[in-house]
Amino acid sequence: MAASTGYVRLWAAARCWVLRRPLLAVTGGRVPSASGSWLRRGCRACDMSAPWGGRVLPGGVQWRGLWDSGNRGGSDETSEGGAEDGATASTGEGPVVTALAPMTVPDVFPHLPLIAITRNPVFPRFIKIVEVKNKKLVELLRRKVRLAQPYVGVFLKRDDNNESDVVESLDEIYHTGTFAQIHEMQDLGDKLRMIVTGHRRIHISRQLEVEPEGLEPEAEKQKSRRKLKRGKKEVEDELGPKPQLEMVTEAATDTSKEVLMVEVENVAHEDFQVTEEVKALTAEIVKTIRDIIALNPLYRESVLQMMQAGQRVVDNPIYLSDMGAALTGAESHELQDVLEETNILKRLYKALSLLKKEFELSKLQQRLGREVEEKIKQTHRKYLLQEQLKIIKKELGLEKDDKDAIEEKFRERLRELVVPKHVMDVVDEELSKLALLDNHSSEFNVTRNYLDWLTSIPWGRQSDENLDLARAQAVLEEDHYGMEDVKKRVLEFIAVSQLRGSTQGKILCFHGPPGVGKTSIARSIARALGREYFRFSVGGMTDVAEIKGHRRTYVGAMPGKIIQCLKKTKTENPLVLIDEVDKIGRGYQGDPSSALLELLDPEQNANFLDHYLDVPVDLSKVLFICTANVIDTIPEPLRDRMEMINVSGYVAQEKLAIAERYLVPQARTLCGLDESKAQLSAAVLTLLIKQYCRESGVRNLQKQVEKVLRKAAYKIVSGEAQTVQVTPENLQDFVGKPVFTVERMYEVTPPGVVMGLAWTAMGGSTLFVETSLRRPQPSGSKEDKDGSLEVTGQLGDVMKESARIAYTYARAFLMEQDPENDFLVTSHIHLHVPEGATPKDGPSAGCTIVTALLSLALGQPVLQNLAMTGEVSLTGKVLPVGGIKEKTIAAKRAGVTCIILPAENRKDYSDLAPFITEGLEVHFVEHYRDIFPIAFPRREHREALAVER
């Protein structure tokens, strides 16, 4: 608003300048002192240079105006064309700023360029800065200024998000706007920046189309004809020069064209009388404005200048209503509503309503600011009082310094512990350093955290162990069924500790298929031994710092998992479970499996060195238990440090016992059921195991049991039944269609097909080997006598080598048994192992492949319900294989009655439980010659009969 007052002064000074311009001829071109001082005050108010000085403002902006024509002493033509001359002259670089001389605003000016603005309309007597970027509109405004027609129509757009300077249709703007005069125009090349002042309200009548610029010379000719008509009243005429109208025509019917010119008409106010109601409204508006000024200092300067500009605003209700609306931050449509209102009384009411809203908003802002300030004061006061209280207590000896309190806390932790001397030396050194550090330094926090970890380790503190064999055995039997090897090893550990009179650490590794209870048995062992339990998984771990910690200098450094374990368990002899040790990763941060070597080495972990603590820690009393699915992926040095215990899968009888003893009661408790509401018989569980859960573990069986009981709970809650009886007949209603409907692929094996036994991480399974002719056998031709063997079924390299060895031995064995049979020598044979999507590898199918090739060559099927496993050498020797328990379980599950195993696996078979080997005929062989009569008993019988004859 200060700029507004400046422009008013400048306008008055310019009028005086125009009136006294003829005196320049008398004074010799000197500016009269009165006019000069007036102009200087006006220019200073607008931050402009005096027009006669010709000075260039900072930034290369030069002010030029219509007043230059007066100094040139031109006639009427010169006066009207001065703006054009001033706009085209250039005496400096940078954007050209044209300050237009104030002139008498015409009462009627129907044809105006249209400028569309957003958010806030321009009210009469108010100034606004407008930027125009549209190329056509920029050219039009330049032309109007050159023709001494610095008038525009400013209209508000209906859409506040539309940032365009022009509109394509009159429907996009409100039709009531403001007739404005351009006071100053800064030409920036691609855009214009103007200061416009509103004068009166106007209404759009229609759209006009702008004629090309070539028609301007006609207007110039008309202007020159008026050159001789100048008389004594030339000074008065110059106060209000008659604007030169640019030729326009009515706009075409094409509505997509940009609206640049419009025809307007003035909006007249309704007649009104200054009644008591009007006086009351004006007084209330003035009072509200003053209240807003008192609350919000931002309005103070601008509003006071507007209200004290040499006139009483109260006496002008029209101006007061516009000023009240313009001061508010109301919505654009509300301000436009005030602009369009022609009834002065209603306009005053609307302006007062907007001012009241602004006043309430200002009060709310002031209240919020006061509350925030009050909170800040209270916090600051509380802080000062606390600091004073600390100083007073310290002076009276009632409270120690923060550093003294921290040191006492750390020493209190170590008072009842047996701390090694080298550790105590480090603690004393760090405490001495802590006392010299500033409380707010970063090194202070690092040292304090280090001491916190160092004093949180249970130096010399051990938990009381349970050395009662009977109690430990009862705990293990209570939690897990089977797993005799694991239980025996734990009881042996307790027995040794009892005889020694002290406990020791040990490193065990349980390996076996998923879901057999490797992780859960570790918790039971901790409970049986009376040790604290801590578990962390190393599956996918790639950072050595997870095990050995970070260096203390790093931001956010922490010790490794083992030190965290000691702090959490508060004992030196916990049971630590390192899960999924076979799935440990390796990354650019190091190899965690190598970091475990020090941790799991009984000779080294008595002085385990964590990177963060950097002092030796005794881990020799920790019982480490690792779990793995396969041991092949465990590095050999790490495997050598652990005692491997195989946790094999379960047979159907074991699964049934586990389900009845553990899984079903646990699932009933989770589902909120008891035995009377949901009953699962042994027949249902057996069918569930046989047709849905054939894997080695019981995790899937647990899921299926929970699924059955959840559906039973739903039926009871929904009111379908009071009790649910699950039977083999309705089992499919609970768990869906059976997953396994066939025990094995071939009920009767044809010639060329033999059942083998395989072992995977999921347990054992049966594996058929199929052989067939690839092309017809040649007859009579001596060419192409050498046969071939093609293998498929996604076999690994080891299994492919085993197939080639078996093929070579089968040809030799057949020529030995039947020299006249050259089937394997001349035939092209295809060998396939079904389930081709499953990768297969290993040498244990050698005997099975030899038998399948001989069966195809002899055209005789093998003994039904026969399965075999074993690696065969090139000379026919049968070598031992692994996974005997899993393979035996798989064979019994498939209904096999006769099994052929390598002789060296007799010890593994003898360790099996009687219920696994029950009903099986087992043959242990050392050479393939021992397998042939077992697999082909009929042939041996026929040969024996032939010998007898």
Swiss-Prot record:
Question: Under which main EC class is this enzyme filed?
Answer: hydrolase
Q: Where in the cell is it found?
A: Mitochondrion matrix
Query: Which keywords does UniProt give here?
Result: ATP-binding, DNA-binding, Hydrolase, Mitochondrion, Nucleotide-binding, Protease, Serine protease, Transit peptide
Ranges where the Lon proteolytic domain occurs: 748-938
Biological process, per Gene Ontology:
cellular response to oxidative stress; chaperone-mediated protein complex assembly; mitochondrion organization; negative regulation of insulin receptor signaling pathway; oxidation-dependent protein catabolic process; protein catabolic process; protein quality control for misfolded or incompletely synthesized proteins; proteolysis
What does the record give under GO molecular function? ADP binding; ATP binding; ATP hydrolysis activity; ATP-dependent peptidase activity; DNA polymerase binding; G-quadruplex DNA binding; identical protein binding; insulin receptor substrate binding
Chief site of localization: mitochondrion
- Which intervals carry biased composition (Basic residues)? 223-232
Q: Where is the active site?
A: S844, K887
Describe the family membership recorded for this protein in Swiss-Prot or TrEMBL.
Belongs to the peptidase S16 family.
This protein's assembly is summarised as: Homohexamer. Organized in a ring with a central cavity. The ATP-binding and proteolytic domains (AP-domain) form a hexameric chamber, while the N-terminal domain is arranged as a trimer of dimers. DNA and RNA binding is stimulated by substrate and inhibited by ATP binding. Interacts with TWNK and mitochondrial DNA polymerase subunit POLG.
Return the protein name.
Lon protease homolog, mitochondrial
Q: Which organism is it from?
A: Mus musculus
The gene from which this protein is expressed is Lonp1
